[in-house]
């Protein structure tokens, strides 16, 4: 299975998603063809390359190589990764990613903005399937009052709002190309929280898994006692869709007081959103109690 990961780095779960996929690459279960960094200022490019070097993984990194933007990489990462140095690096240009992917079958996992999707589709590079961390299925879709979001139909979601123009363009293009697209929604993600006690005592079998355990434990001890691993859940959906309950929808939006808010309406679209899932089993895969 060929996989491309597009990630941002503001939340630690993107880092963990990269390490999660890298583990299965090092186990020979998948071929991680490329990592695309959203947006790709020098310090962010450096961070992603640092991670890959640390786990001895030779995978090409691509980005838009924008000017330095400190908002893409939190300061606390330099505490979390004690040997991470503030350096400037460029990635390969996204045009080179097109050359790499043309003619290949691959699945795309998106943990950052949706900016890469229209870039690929408009350049006639079509993933087999797309898995996006983002979106919201309200009570009109789930039929249930949510334990955190109540009876809401709309909610702001970070990834969709990171580049609203790209999000809207993505769904416009998907009407035309109808690539199977799976949205791993915040209404499910926020009900699957990982604590340190969930992490099994097991010997890591790859460099990526070793760093995954190390960083997850350190994060939970130092910064937050429990964490939803949104992007890791998107990776799990790519491996095993039947762990999740899906409904076919069209994403819709409205202007909120502060941010654009997103919801869903049922429709034939080939876009599917999570409305439920086997939470304990998803959690087991997220902490490697179970493996694919």
UniProtKB/Swiss-Prot annotation:
Alphabetized InterPro entries for the sequence: Inosine/uridine_hydrolase_dom, Ribo_hydro-like
Molecular functions (GO terms): hydrolase activity, hydrolyzing N-glycosyl compounds
SUPFAM superfamilies: Nucleoside hydrolase
Family matches, as Pfam families: IU_nuc_hydro (PF01156)
Gene3D superfamilies registered for this protein in UniProt: Ribonucleoside hydrolase-like
Protein name: Uncharacterized protein aq_983
């Amino acid at each position: 299975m060929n996989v491309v990961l597009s990630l941002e780095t503001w939340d630690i779960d993107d880092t963990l998603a990269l390490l999660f996929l890298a583990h299965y690459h090092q186990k020979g279960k998948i071929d991680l063809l490329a990592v695309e960094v959203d947006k790709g200022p020098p310090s962010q490019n450096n961070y992603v390359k640092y991670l890959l070097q640390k786990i001895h993984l030779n995978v090409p990194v691509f980005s838009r190589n924008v000017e330095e933007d400190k908002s893409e990489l939190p300061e606390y990462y330099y505490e979390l990764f004690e040997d991470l140095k503030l350096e400037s690096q460029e990635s390969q240009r996204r045009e080179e990613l097109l050359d790499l992917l043309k003619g290949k079958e691959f699945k795309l996992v998106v943990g950052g903005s949706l900016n890469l999707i229209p870039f690929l589709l408009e350049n006639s590079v079509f993933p087999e399937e797309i898995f996006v961390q983002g979106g919201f299925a309200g009570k009109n879709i789930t039929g249930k009052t949510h334990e955190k979001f109540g009876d809401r139909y709309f909610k702001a979601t970070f990834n969709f709002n990171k580049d609203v123009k790209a999000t809207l363009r993505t769904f416009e293009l998907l009407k035309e190309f109808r690539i199977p697209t799976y949205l791993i929604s915040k209404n499910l993600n926020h009900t699957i929280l990982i604590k340190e006690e969930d992490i099994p005592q097991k010997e890591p079998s790859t460099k990526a898994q070793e760093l995954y355990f190390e960083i997850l434990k350190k994060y939970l001890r130092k910064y937050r006692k429990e964490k939803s691993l949104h992007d890791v859940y998107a990776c799990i959906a790519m491996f095993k869709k039947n762990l999740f309950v899906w409904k076919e929808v069209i994403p819709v939006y409205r202007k909120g007081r502060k941010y654009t808010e997103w919801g869903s309406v049922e429709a034939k679209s080939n876009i599917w959103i999570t409305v439920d899932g086997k939470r304990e089993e998803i959690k087991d895969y997220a902490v490697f109690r179970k493996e694919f």
